[in-house]
């Protein structure tokens, strides 16, 4: 009925455009108002269908009626039941669907606390990171979460990609270590770490706090306890860092051969878990060929300015060339 009235008003408005432009403008405003009211009615109807009542159980005894952010209520269904139509209550899954697929879609990679369904390659633990607490699989080294809530092995391409990501994590570790320096003659690690000499990176030879497990470097050079959320977040980062180590040591990115000079005389070929890799000496770092190269120092500000000017000149010449074309 509302759409018919809108159509009539629109037709009348079109016929009177030439007579009165002001009237046409008013008709357009009225038309927009009626359309907005119709959209609000549709949204209200849709939201009403998705609500349950807080004082009654309309979730078919297979879920809980929970109050949402805006004062509305909705059904949080138990596994493997799902919210269905027309009353948005909890219904069993359709026939012919695999339990594993239902679990993957409804639980979003969750595992069950009383079962071991991480494919034998992880541990099912309660996660508090994010908006909701839930059980998830913490996969072992070399495995990742899959679409079915378990753990699957990384592919070679995934491992190679993670190796590049982990190199940035090494820079993050250098930055964090430089903020947590200490003095050799004092104990200012807040009794939660050890003040040691740094043997790698830009700050090699300086003293830093190596904090105990569960602590982190603070802005005062000591060690402060991590929060639960920080520990869980760093645990996720550590898995990627472990993957990078796996790549460098087990996938020939940094392998060397014992008894040969594969480290360019600037490092030592060491053995770990049956694999060999280069441990570079002071002032050297690993290169893409698996050997050791001198650490490149940052260019001076004058060199940076000259490079910037040359870059601007090249861009200017390129722009002129494109205009001529």
UniProtKB/Swiss-Prot annotation:
Residues 48-91, 107-152, 178-224, 252-293 form the EGF-like domain. SMART domains: EGF. InterPro entries: EGF-like_dom (IPR000742), Nephronectin_domain (IPR052235). Pfam families: EGF. Keywords: Disulfide bond, EGF-like domain, Repeat, Signal. The keyword Disulfide bond applies. Residues 1-17 form the signal peptide. This is Fibropellin-2. It comes from Strongylocentrotus purpuratus (Purple sea urchin). The lineage of its organism: Eukaryota, Metazoa, Echinodermata, Eleutherozoa, Echinozoa.
